[in-house]
Every structure is written in C-alpha cells, then in structure tokens.
C-alpha cells in the first residue's frame, strides 16, 4: 500500500533499508524521484505538489480572498505507529527541524522500541446553554426523563444515514455551572459519534434541533447551541517504549518531564513541542488545526500533556490527547494536496488518522526532550458559508454551483440543517431539469 511498509519488515530490514536513509542529503528533485521509485508518489502527483491550491477552490473556501498563502509540505520517513511503518508521513509546517525530528525519532523507535496508540472514545460533544434556570434539579429531571426519546428522534429523523454508518447520538447529560456573581447556568451536553467526520456542522445542527423541544419541556430559554472543541469523548492515548537509553540521559528526560508536569510556564513550551507534530500532520490532512490546539491546551490546563519515566533500562512516554479529526467533509475532499496526503496514508479512517497524529506528537515530544537534555446562532451562518464547498464536493460544475447553492439555501432556511446528501439530491434534480 502507498505510504506503508509491511509489518513483516518492521523488525528486520526496515531500519537498514536504503530507501529510508539519506533523505536530508537529497535535493528536492532527488527526494521526489525516491518517493516515485518507492511507489509513494506517481509522476502525476508532481503537479499537485507544485501546483498549490487552485484559485477556483480557494475562492469558495473563505471570504474576501486575495491569494493563497503557501506552507512547506514535507514527508517524515519510516514512522512506526502501531503495527505499521509509514514510509512517508505528510507534514505541513513553516518551522525548521519538525519533520527531521519526527524522522530521527522514528528511526530510534524502529530500531529499539515501539509506539502504540489507542482510541479511548469516538463521541463529539455539543452544548446547549440555559441561563437563569429557576429549578436546576427539576430541569435536569425533565431532560433526563426525555433522554431516550430525544436520542431516538435524532437518530431516526435527523441523522439516519450516520446511524447506518455506525454512528449516531449516544448520550445526553446535564451540568450545573456556578458563576462568580452568585448566579448559575445549566448546560445540556449531547454526545454524537460522527464516524469519519470531524462532526462540527452536524453537532451544531443537532443542538439547534434540540433547542425547541428542550425549551418547551422545561419552560426555559436556550442561549448558545454549539459543539465543544474540548473533545474529552474522543481521547487518543499514545505510548512509546524505548530501549537502549543511556541511564543518565533517561533520568534527565524524566526530570524535564516532571518540570513540565509541575510548572505551567514550562508546560506551555513542552506542549507546544507536541503540537508541532500534531498540527503539521493535521494541516497536511485538512483538519481544523485551531480546534485541535484549543482542545489540547484546555485539556492540559497548565500541566504537561505527556509524561516520561525511566522503568528499568527503558524510557517510557505516555500521552492522552483529545483529537477530533475527520477524513470526510470539510476540505478533505476538495483540496488537491489534502487528497494526496490522505492517499499517501492509505486513506485512513478518522480513528486511524487520530492515532497517526497522536503518535507523531509524542515522537516530536521525545525529540524535543532529547534535544533539550543534550548539551547545549452559528449553525445557519456557518453552514451558509459552507454551501459552496458542498456544491463542489458533490461534483457540481462551475455553471451548476450557483443554482445548487440557492437550492441548498432554501433547504437550510426551511429545516435549519443541510447535508452532502441534500447537495447530491439537488444536483441530480438540476441535471434532470436541464
């Protein structure tokens, strides 16, 4: 498979494979030839790598566009995550040494260790805020009494296709938040498993849909209805075990970890190093990097995201990180370089991509510590702006996009939600009428 070295080679020829050595000494053309020779790239991919983002697509992604801002795209090589070694791991970053660090630490782990990850949850959280609830406990009892019916309604009438794909709404909870002025807020949390989508748009639409029945049942008024980027229901754990570590160096790394775990000033820089890897893979694969950054730093809340300890002769690194990513939706299907990056990674599921991102972050963290211890109402507005992407994503040509966007705007105005299925249906209708 493209981008992957078969598992049977991991403990043998991989570390000495000539195709994995010397990349830093090659010029750009030689690196591309090496990747073409190994099957990671095809000659046709060179136009995508060098062509950047087409103006036509960029024009529909943001408002007031005047150009395209380039960021270097590189490949970390030989990255071992779980039972695979990724020959090429796409990373987009402006910062020197990030790609090299992941490649160098990958070589160490391939030769004398392992990097494993685990998916700890798949739910995306949405929040519906109710301010000045007169009887919070009574409110909670009413909402929890409606829980099963609301979940069934959502799964049957709002997201049946997602349920068919193995996802759906799974939970409703109520939280009470004291405010320093002596008042309080009550917040309804909804949890939706969004399959391979990051899920922001559908979660926002579900929160909007639930506003009416919750207000009617509780005689309370909802304020904000929006997803949370603190993705505590989509945690990924990453674990590195590295042998052959000099005991003095290992102890220094452990003490550096303790420094970050107990000092927020150091924690900020420690965690920034992790995010160097996380954000680079996320950007290359078309993810919302701001959402990942916000969730990670809130989750850390002044402490370190990772811990490192010497256990006997081995250095052990552990990390948990909220990673809500998607391999469908957003720009994943319209940005040519993102599509290429996904293909190089063998078109991973959202779970697999989250594992890759977490593992890369922990490798980056290991590299940083090694170096340091050496010398020296959002739904409608947002969805309206997203409609051109839906039109492009379903295959509408330049002449069809305007009428299709108008059609989708009508659906959004009538129902408060719109989906890729609506776009496909609308395109079929337009073509039937042509």
Label each residue range with its predicted role.
Residues 46, 114-120, 157-173, 217-229, ...:
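Flexible, glycine/charged-enriched surface loops at secondary-structure junctions
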Residues 62-71, 101-115, 152-179:
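Conserved alpha/beta core surface patches that mediate binding of polyanionic ligands
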Residues 1-87, 115, 119-123, 402, ...:
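Acidic/polar, glycine-rich intrinsically disordered N-terminal extensions of enzymes
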Residues 285-291, 297-396, 401:
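C-terminal catalytic subdomain
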Residues 71-101, 195-203, 261-287, 361-371, ...:
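Conserved phosphate/anionic-ligand binding catalytic regions in large, soluble enzymes, centered on
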Residues 196-338:
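Glycine-rich anion/phosphate-binding loop at the beta-strand->alpha-helix junction
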Residues 122-261:
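Glycine-rich, mobile lid/loop segments that gate access to catalytic sites or pores
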Residues 60, 68-76, 183-190, 250-265, ...:
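Short, hydrophobic/aliphatic alpha-helical segments
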